[in-house]
């Protein structure tokens, strides 16, 4: 899934990124919050590894393609932060058979269609 990075370039100061991650994870205001960072902006396994190294195990992404990309790189608890498309139920189900995949729904009809289709 290299296509996720075709349209952007990034310059990342890894030392600063590590400091920012550590600051959030040690901030007492967030002590009782389950931290699930959104990986839409960086779309980078290298940056994702900074989060993993800091103990983060759950992530949020913006599409099925991004979920597949990060799942293929060892992330196994992923939330897709857009409403699920029932037309992609087969693809969601395949991925959910490999990882802990969470989906959002925005209507009772979508929920019903997904519940009747998804097995995992």
Language-model regions, residue ranges each:
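N-terminal glycine-rich anion-binding loops that anchor highly charged ligand groups
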Residues: 16-47
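Generic N-terminal amphipathic, Lys/Arg-enriched alpha-helix
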Residues: 1-12
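Active-site-proximal beta-alpha core segment in soluble small-molecule metabolic enzymes
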Residues: 38-120
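Non-membrane alpha-helical structural segments and their capping/turn regions in soluble enzymes
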Residues: 11-14, 18, 108
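A generic structural signal for short
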Residues: 12-13, 35-36, 55
């Amino acid at each position: 899934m290299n296509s996720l990075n075709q349209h952007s370039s990034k310059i990342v100061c890894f030392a600063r990124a590590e400091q920012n991650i550590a600051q959030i994870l040690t901030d007492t205001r967030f002590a009782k919050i389950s931290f699930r960072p959104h990986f839409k902006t960086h779309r980078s396994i290298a940056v994702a590894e900074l989060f993993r190294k800091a103990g983060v195990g759950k992530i949020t992404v913006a599409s099925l393609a991004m979920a597949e990309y990060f799942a293929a790189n060892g992330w196994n608890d992923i939330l897709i932060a857009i409403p699920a498309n029932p037309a992609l139920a087969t693809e969601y189900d395949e991925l959910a058979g490999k990882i802990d995949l969470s989906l959002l729904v925005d209507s009772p009809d979508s929920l019903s269609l997904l519940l009747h289709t998804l097995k995992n």
